[in-house]
Amino acid sequence: MADPYGWIRADLESLHRVGWYRTTRTHNGLAGPQMDVDGKPVLQFASNDYLGLSGDERLIEAACRAVRLYGAGATGSRLLSGERDVHRELEQALAGWKGCDDCLVFSSGYLANLGTIPALVGKRDLVVGDEYNHACLRGGAELSGAVHRLYPHGDCSALESLLIEQRERHRRCLICTDSVFSMDGDLIDLARIADLARRYGCMLLVDEAHATGVLGPTGAGAVEQLGLTRSLVQMGTLSKALGSQGGYVCGSAELVDYLRNRARSFVYTTGLAPAAAAAALEAVHIARTETPRRALLRQNIARLRAGIDEIGIAQLPSDAAILCLWVGDIEATHCFAGELFEEGIFAPAVRPPTVPTSRIRLSLMATHTEAMIDSLIAALTQVSSRFS
């Protein structure tokens, strides 16, 4: 009888064949702009820790206090034995920061979308999303059983055409989009999308994972920066600029109450570890009040962008802390990243199927120094000269 698991080997071989095979690399040391990767000291330009808070002593102390007070884990679903006062304090802090009535915290950002979208729509409904939406937005849409339609990246005219064609055929419609796109760094035209949602009677879910802590007067994200006041669903993560772990959904009190009862990835899973919640709560306070930290991040972004322009490497348009470089096909991009690593820079290649075209993805932190940025620019200059 044939091996029922034999297909796995064939699939792995196909990943190797097309250059899509990936492995993990071990990072050691305190989270920050300098780490050891596979035993080699490098400058870290792949982390989503945009404000440099993950290794901040205040977050570490908050997490340690929570462990001593509550123990290592939440021990159960928050609807059973897993609710702690720090969960509610975090939700109230996030809701206040985001300008919403209430908030619900999940165990990860992925779970937040995987639970929220199927709770809002079902088989009689429509989900419309940007073709470059994060996998958890697309996964949530597919899991819901709703009709799922994608429009070309950033094309609001195509979005409107889809709504004209499809909206009247369905009971409810949910528009899903990232605000800042994780593999490009560009900010979408949220004001136009919000207007289309209003005109066509659609719910709107905005994933602020890469905008929270980075954009807006207080760092609350693109929704704050653009001054959007229309009722919408603000989703985000605690694991990027906030330096901890977990996800959240902010919105009306009624929406949050509904999700608390209907979002399966909240109801049927263990609550966020109290230590992660406490660290995130401290991070919200820091991100909201320490505006110089965001100013440092913006300076680093501008310095690196200018350096890349001077070298002449093609880069994608970006509005955030993510800069993506085009250096060739899959093989060339992989080799380019390998040579950067030899120069002491960790900036791995991002390849299909994660993105449609291979690229070097650089992410910046407020804690990168000017000297670190200049070291990256020097390494890019050296490596690109060997590839030209």
Swiss-Prot record:
It catalyses: 6-carboxyhexanoyl-[ACP] + L-alanine + H(+) = (8S)-8-amino-7-oxononanoate + holo-[ACP] + CO2. The keyword Transferase applies. Its EC number is 2.3.1.47. Pfam families: Aminotran_1_2. InterPro entries: Aminotrans_II_pyridoxalP_BS, Aminotransferase_I/II_large, AON_synthase_class-II, AONS_Archaea/Proteobacteria, PyrdxlP-dep_Trfase, PyrdxlP-dep_Trfase_major, PyrdxlP-dep_Trfase_small. Keywords: Biotin biosynthesis, Pyridoxal phosphate, Transferase. The modification N6-(pyridoxal phosphate)lysine is found at residue 240. The keyword Transferase applies. Homodimer. This is Putative 8-amino-7-oxononanoate synthase. It comes from Gloeobacter violaceus (strain ATCC 29082 / PCC 7421). The gene is bioF.
